[in-house]
UniProtKB/Swiss-Prot annotation:
Gene: tgt
Name this protein carries in UniProt: Queuine tRNA-ribosyltransferase
Keyword match Translocase: no
Enzyme class, first EC level, given as a word: transferase
Active site: D92, D266
Family recorded in the similarity comment: Belongs to the queuine tRNA-ribosyltransferase family.
Entry keywords, A to Z: Glycosyltransferase, Metal-binding, Queuosine biosynthesis, Transferase, tRNA processing, Zinc
Region (RNA binding) location: 247-253, 271-275
Co-factor remark: Binds 1 zinc ion per subunit.
Subunit structure: Homodimer. Within each dimer, one monomer is responsible for RNA recognition and catalysis, while the other monomer binds to the replacement base PreQ1.
Cofactor needs: Zn(2+)
Pfam families in the record: TGT
Binding residues annotated for Zn(2+), in chain numbering: C304, C306, C309, H335
């Protein structure tokens, strides 16, 4: 079994390309992780996700702990076997979903108490329990429990939240069972305040996490402010550890973040957009529902190798989506995930060549 490691092969300004080696295989970076919230990437067979070029998936601890339960997944051989995926899986801590329950949850020093949105059952998600759940799932990369600081927050509110995240990170690290090829990432908080972000990095680096995620962004602050935060946070972070920007997936945001030293991304945008009839292409987005595509004989993209582009026209995809045929969202999702993996492949190639990669419309 391979040890967990991160090797940077090429640099271009702040951008890096390399390989993360794990117990479940290698991850080419920069990388985009399709979101498999409940143990499936919506509208996709697992083997189809492989064909898009994805190296790693994201699973959601909150949803999986409720249905079918971490214990049941462990009994059935772990999340990899359960969903027939033999590549790396990163699981979030469940914190973001729990925090978003608002009226159904309460935050204390111990953790977050909440009621299930499914049946009202009460749970307490602590740093230790979140880490245990992810262990039972068999996650390749486990995330420490954090409090996702809302935006906007005052300096004092952000500081209080950041300090709680630091204490939870310490407990998460203590609870993590170290195994060869497996990893745990800490999550940097501090809202939009440079002083707090720097302090958060200093605090979490003491726990020697295997990688570091940047949380609390893409929550309403806008691209300009997000990039401003990334400009200085990347200078604070260790150069030899992977950096993960959580929940960011717009192509222009990915390119801007990679140029600021980010290695990993996840987002529901490609799958959600696909189900809603929106396709990403090198020439901009296509709303396939639009009547102008009703007799369009061209594919979404001529040089895309996905089944939607190699086998079907825009007119056919328009027809499927308009009549709400289930094949429509499946093909649109397959195309979008392929687009995102092609985007990451192009970015990696440009970094290796030492060229600018601002090629998103």
């Amino acid at each position: 079994m391979s040890k967990f490691s991160f090797t940077i092969h090429s640099n271009y300004k702040k951008a890096r390309s390399g390989v993360i080696t794990t117990a479940h295989g290698k991850i080419r970076t920069p990388t985009f992780m399709p979101v498999g919230t409940r143990g499936t990437v919506k509208a996709m067979l697992t083997e189809s996700v492989v064909e898009t070029g994805a190296d790693i998936l994201l699973g959601n601890t909150y949803h999986l702990m409720l249905q079918p339960s971490a214990e049941r997944i462990a009994y059935l051989g772990g999340l990899h076997k359960f969903m027939n995926w033999d590549k790396p899986i990163l699981t979030d801590s469940g914190g973001f979903q729990v925090m978003s329950l608002s009226k159904l949850r309460k935050i204390t020093e111990e953790g977050v108490s909440f009621r299930s949105h499914i049946n009202g059952n009460k749970y307490m998600l602590t740093p230790e329990y979140s880490t245990e759940i992810q262990y039972l799932l068999g996650s390749t990369i486990t995330m420490a429990l954090d409090e996702c600081t809302p935006y906007p927050s005052t300096f004092e509110e952000a500081k209080t939240s950041m300090n709680l995240t630091t204490r939870w990170a310490n407990r998460s690290r203590d609870a993590f069972v170290k195994r060869e090829g497996y990893a745990q990432f800490g999550i940097i908080q501090g809202s939009v305040y440079k002083e707090l972000r720097e302090q958060s990095v200093k605090d979490l680096v003491k726990f020697d996490f295997d990688g570091y995620a940047i949380g609390g962004l893409a929550v309403g602050e806008g691209q300009e402010l997000m990039f401003k935060v990334l400009d200085y946070v990347s200078d604070f972070l260790p150069q030899n550890k992977p950096r993960y920007l959580m929940g960011v997936g717009k192509p222009a945001d990915i390119i801007g973040a990679v140029s600021r030293g980010i290695d990993m991304f996840d987002c529901v945008i490609p799958t959600r957009s696909g189900r809603n009839g929106q396709a990403f292409t090198k020439y901009g987005t296509v709303n396939i529902r639009n009547s102008k595509y009703a007799e369009d004989k061209a594919p979404l993209e001529y040089d895309c190798k996905c089944p939607a582009c190699t086998n079907y026209t825009k007119a056919y995809l328009h027809h499927l989506v308009r009549i709400r045929e289930i094949l429509g969202p499946m093909l649109m999702t397959w195309h979008n995930l392929t687009y995102f993996q092609n985007l990451m492949s192009r970015i990696r190639a440009y970094i290796k060549l030492g060229k600018d990669f601002d090629f998103v419309n």
